[in-house]
Regions:
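Short leucine-rich amphipathic alpha-helical surface patches
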Residues: 141-144, 153-156
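Active-site acidic carboxylates
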Residues: 1-95, 117, 146-150, 159, ...
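Conserved N-terminal glycine/acidic-rich loop preference
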Residues: 96-135, 158-178
């Protein structure tokens, strides 16, 4: 089975940094477990990294969310916890994809290139469910017409009720929630 795991923006600034929140910290073990299983199964893994620059506050997103975060070259930009090891070690079945917006078409291209076509399954975990996770799930769902799209609810996080609302929207779009 051709399978990909996408770990969305599980970075220091979203866990214990500029935009950190407890729910994001509480899913660390679930994410580590999913990554470990994907490595053991030789699945393709994409770690997306929200990536901004010194001019962040001048961008559309910066005006919407005026909190500098994930600035390239800062500790907050790095992958959180044990995932930071993937920034140091080259692994043939794992890539890091820097993205400057909530969702990235390059994610679809990266997955498609890895499989020379469409995978059977694309799984998602990470943060923030109602912003970057949902954006990338919808992009992949639109791009890959036959792949099963799966979101690990217990390995995603958002603030307050936004988690529930985002999961309900994804269910309504036919995404498999596990």
């Amino acid at each position: 089975m051709k399978k990909a795991l996408v770990v969305v923006d599980y970075q220091n600034d979203f866990v214990d940094g500029a935009l950190g929140f407890l729910a994001a910290e509480n899913i660390a073990d679930k994410i580590y477990s999913l990554v470990g299983k994907a490595m053991a199964d030789r699945s393709f893994i994409v770690f997306t990294k929200d990536t901004h620059y010194d001019n962040y506050l001048e961008t559309r997103e910066g005006k919407f969310l005026p909190v500098p975060h994930c600035i390239k070259g800062t500790p907050g930009h790095g992958l959180y916890g044990m995932l930071a090891d993937f920034e140091e070690v080259v692994t043939p079945n794992a890539v890091i994809l820097e993205k400057e917006t909530f969702g990235s078409d390059r994610l679809c291209e990266t997955i498609e290139e890895a499989f020379s076509g469409e995978p059977d399954v694309i799984e998602f975990c990470g943060v923030v469910t109602n912003i970057c996770v949902i954006s990338n799930v919808i992009l992949c769902q639109a791009h890959f017409k036959n792949a099963e799209i799966v979101v690990h609810e217990d390995a995603t996080a958002a603030l307050g009720d936004m988690q529930h609302y985002a999961i309900e929207v994804l269910k309504g779009l036919g995404v498999k929630i596990v």
